[in-house]
A protein has these predicted regions:
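C-terminal motif of bacterial Sec signal peptides marking the signal peptidase cleavage site
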Residues: 16-20
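Predominantly extracellular/secreted Zn2+-dependent metalloproteases
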Residues: 28-324, 335-415
Length: 415
């Protein structure tokens, strides 16, 4: 006798619907499950509307459409419900993924099951797929390898079905480690509203630069999620003492620890030092779920604050590949809420976030411990048609005096 689990799902157009599910235990040992076919997203029919986002010659208006182009840095592989019967699949990554499983979760059924299995998803891919549950009755694989059979469902209201992604791909494993939940997008509000006396304060970006920016922010988010960064951030006073010892000085140069936005009396070494609890809170401001608008400047200064963080074209094209993250770290700190009075933004007073993050970032490149370390995955530096400057292939070198190299001596890779 078939074991049926029935429950009610909310719908936009229907009052309720009873759904039947049967699991392995009700089928017997001889049941042979027939799962949905796997999908190669590099070879999709036109009905799936496959495309590559951020093609070099794509109109910039598309990347500036914040209703269509956005992602959270810890979820570069994005699955969004479209209407009551379809999903939009997008990958915000310069490198594709293999062996990707998209799981679904229904109300009142506590197990996730595989609704799509992609053998390949190419870089910056987007396509659309019908939710198989609306097509008819199917077998689905549960996380534990067992099978559940679900009857046809006519459609789903927003939020009635939840999607999540898993993959055995080593790149995806790095994505999963990212703690930051920043919502990343591009905004044209800055360059379209330049002041009359500074017409190049902000410059428009294009898909070539957007791809570099996306690559950089994923790497940056990984770096500030890294155990070495967290340990150094939480124990910044120890880091400063280690710097002094390495330099052979008896006293720490500048502030002894993190301090906030209040005006300081550096001459008398008076700072508004943060407590341990406040330092933990400060760390969370770097990784919370606020919106980040990435932009580009053309004037004498980069800018950050509120949702904005920006830098010059060179930072996007070559700088981040070489680990030159000082400007970006500074503006990202303004975006996270810190002023020039705080060493969380300011590089002065013996060094602060700008200096420490840059050293750490370079050490992670040295360890090959970022999601992306090869500038040739994009070759943005070669695409002179879309750039204002002329660039050579970025070549990374590490300073033998890098404090993380001195301390960890090639160890500390995230395992």
């Amino acid at each position: 006798m078939r074991k049926t689990i029935s429950y009610v799902l909310p719908f936009a157009l229907f009052a309720s619907l009873l759904v039947g599910c049967s699991d392995d235990d009700s089928k017997g040992d001889n049941y042979k499950a027939e799962y949905l076919a796997s999908i190669d997203a590099t070879n999709l029919p036109k009905e799936n509307r496959p495309m590559t986002m951020f093609e070099d010659n794509e109109s910039s208006s598309k990347m500036y459409d914040n209703k269509d182009r956005w992602f959270r840095v810890n979820q570069p592989m994005q699955v969004i419900q479209k209407g009551k019967d379809s999903v939009q699949v997008s990958l915000y990554s310069p490198v594709g993924l293999t062996d990707v499983k998209v799981y679904a979760k229904l109300p009142n059924y506590d197990k996730r099951f595989v609704v799509y299995e992609f053998t390949k998803v190419p870089a910056f891919h987007r396509s659309f797929h019908q939710i198989p549950l609306v097509e008819g009755k199917h077998d689905y694989k549960l996380e534990d390898g067992k099978t559940v059979t679900i009857d046809k469902i006519d459609g789903f209201s927003s939020g009635a079905i939840q999607f999540s992604v898993e993959s055995s791909d080593p790149l995806f494993e790095k994505f999963k480690r990212i703690k930051s939940a920043r919502l990343v997008q591009f905004s044209d509000q800055y360059h379209l509203n330049n002041p009359a006396d500074d017409p190049n304060k902000f410059l428009p970006m294009n898909p070539v630069l957007a791809k570099e920016a996306i690559t950089m922010i994923i790497n940056y988010s990984y770096a500030i999620s890294h155990p070495l960064y967290y340990d150094t951030f939480i124990n910044f006073d120890r880091y400063k003492q280690e710097q002094a010892a390495t330099a052979g000085t008896a006293t720490v140069n500048g502030a002894l620890n993190w301090h906030g936005n209040a005006d300081d009396d550096a001459a008398n070494a008076v700072y508004d030092y943060l407590t341990k609890a406040q330092i933990e809170t400060a760390y969370n401001t770097y990784i919370d779920n606020r919106t980040l608008n990435m932009a580009m400047v053309g004037g004498n200064s980069a800018w950050g604050g509120g949702p904005l963080a920006s830098q010059w074209e060179s930072g996007y094209v070559t700088g981040h590949w070489k680990g030159e993250m000082s400007v970006w770290s500074h503006e990202y700190s303004h975006h996270s809420g810190y002023s020039h009075s705080s060493n969380l933004a300011n590089s002065g007073e013996g060094g602060g976030q700008q200096e420490m993050l840059t050293h750490l970032y370079k050490y992670l490149i040295y360890l090959n411990d970022l999601p992306f370390t090869d500038p040739d995955v994009l070759k943005g530096y070669t695409k002179t048609t879309y750039l204002t400057g002329t660039y050579k292939k970025p070549v990374f070198t590490v300073d033998p005096k890098n404090p993380f190299l001195i301390k960890y001596k090639g160890e500390g890779k995230w395992k």
